[in-house]
Amino acid sequence: MIIPAIDLIDGQVVRLYQGDYDKQTTFDLSPLAQLQSYQAQGAKLLHIVDLTGAKDPNKRQTKLIAELAAGLDVDIQVGGGIRSEDQVAELLAIGVKRVVIGSLAVKEPELVKSWFVKYGSDAICLALDVNINDNGDKIVAVSGWQSGGGKSLESLVAEFETVGLKHALVTDISRDGTLTGANTELYTELAATYPNILWQASGGIATLDNVAAVRDSKASGIIIGKALLINQFTVEEAIQCWPNA
């Protein structure tokens, strides 16, 4: 499945290079018009990251996200700075299909597990930003990559499998925003090891060949942000390469 994505800072569509707020590119685009274009080209799920909220949870762009949800017919998943159950409930109430939880799953797993129990495993996607070291260990980073987490991907997945983890978005940090291609070996391994989890691949997608490689890795979906914004290819072309299941 093709999952077009936009990142938002102060209401503007942006891209960061490897998660660095000092390496920001701003695009002169309307967020809603951009997402409606992706929807019109056949996307069935859209991914929105509130980078302002990720940096400062008090400045979450909830009003904008409500406007986006209202202006779209397809499902949206939203992440960025979600720290409390009130915020989860609010996003679900304004029409968000799935809430993306990152750092908090590492820092406060019991809290996040309680949300799986309350809202169901379809309502939450874990976002695991992974640093892979020279030994091949997959270490999950926290807080928008500004600090290391120290927990292995495998231990975190094992913990959340107990509450029915179904959706997980995995980014190899070294690839994000680089357009160097996805880490397909990682997704092949994850899909084989955890066949009951729908893995969303993210980071580094530059070409339709990259899209095909992720499709063949047996990931369930691929998040594409920068490549679409800079017109490397269109959503329509990506869906032709990997039809929505």
Curated annotation (Swiss-Prot):
One of its GO terms (molecular function) is 1-(5-phosphoribosyl)-5-[(5-phosphoribosylamino)methylideneamino]imidazole-4-carboxamide isomerase activity. Keywords: Amino-acid biosynthesis, Cytoplasm, Histidine biosynthesis, Isomerase. One of its GO terms (biological process) is L-histidine biosynthetic process. It is an enzyme of class 5 (isomerase). Its main location: cytoplasm. Coiled coil: none annotated. Its EC number is 5.3.1.16. It catalyses: 1-(5-phospho-beta-D-ribosyl)-5-[(5-phospho-beta-D-ribosylamino)methylideneamino]imidazole-4-carboxamide = 5-[(5-phospho-1-deoxy-D-ribulos-1-ylimino)methylamino]-1-(5-phospho-beta-D-ribosyl)imidazole-4-carboxamide. It is found in: Cytoplasm. Pfam families: His_biosynth. Pathway: Amino-acid biosynthesis; L-histidine biosynthesis; L-histidine from 5-phospho-alpha-D-ribose 1-diphosphate: step 4/9. The active site is at D7, D129. One of its GO terms (cellular component) is cytoplasm. NCBIfam families: 1-(5-phosphoribosyl)-5-[(5-phosphoribosylamino)methylideneamino]imidazole-4-carboxamide isomerase (TIGR00007). Belongs to the HisA/HisF family. PANTHER family: 1-(5-PHOSPHORIBOSYL)-5-[(5-PHOSPHORIBOSYLAMINO)METHYLIDENEAMINO] IMIDAZOLE-4-CARBOXAMIDE ISOMERASE (PTHR43090:SF2). This is 1-(5-phosphoribosyl)-5-[(5-phosphoribosylamino)methylideneamino] imidazole-4-carboxamide isomerase. It comes from Shewanella frigidimarina (strain NCIMB 400).
